[in-house]
């Protein structure tokens, strides 16, 4: 998919933040050190999802669970998804739940129109089962704005996201997209890109550092695949606040076991 190129004026309009934004979700501080880990629920069935949630709930190295709704066999059945989401939230207890529909436009399994995307998320937000919601920044802009406002009204944090499984955009473009997410009202800024070279990995990491110097928002950035693993491990050194790990099955190329990830994060964590 060819994504729109954003202007670079967003970087110029931002100044070095005086302090970082932090959020307390189910007693978890998001936005400060140490880096918080996310683990995906990649199930196709209700039973598999419940089992995976129990494993995440019991794993001390997993801080947040991501519910990959698009991977479910019944992803289009809103009522079933909401019911399952409520069960997952109960099982996870003190661990936050991030609800995500990764659409086919950005490497996911569910193909939906902008109207359908807005309708589904609006239904979820009537009585939220999640504490965080992933909203793709390049969906219809009016829908993104409406969903972001609705999520905030319901006290749900917005993880605004962008994914490029084909390439790594320029450093300038990555910076521009992340700062655009900030201007669009995101609480957490996310981008995932695919490297073709070592330089691509450093492009993502340098962009993360630049955005961290211009935005107060927590950053969730990654260079995917084995080549980009270092970006997940050293994210704190670049100003990142969150990183994806896995227990069992990965939801994206390059994810590593969450226990190993946690140890790596502790080893390279910069001194405050």
UniProtKB/Swiss-Prot annotation:
Active site positions, chain numbering: 163, 190
Coiled coil regions in record: none
Keywords associated with the record: Lyase, Quinate metabolism, Schiff base
Enzyme Commission designation: 4.2.1.10
One Pfam family named in its UniProt record: DHquinase_I
InterPro entries found in the cross-reference section: 3-dehydroquinate_DH_AS, Aldolase_TIM, DHquinase_I, Type-I_3-dehydroquinase
Pathway: Aromatic compound metabolism; 3,4-dihydroxybenzoate biosynthesis; 3,4-dihydroxybenzoate from 3-dehydroquinate: step 1/2
SUPFAM superfamilies per the UniProt record, alphabetical: Aldolase
Alphabetical list of CDD domains matching this protein: DHQase_I
HAMAP family xrefs: AroD (MF_00214)
Protein name stated in the entry: Catabolic 3-dehydroquinate dehydratase
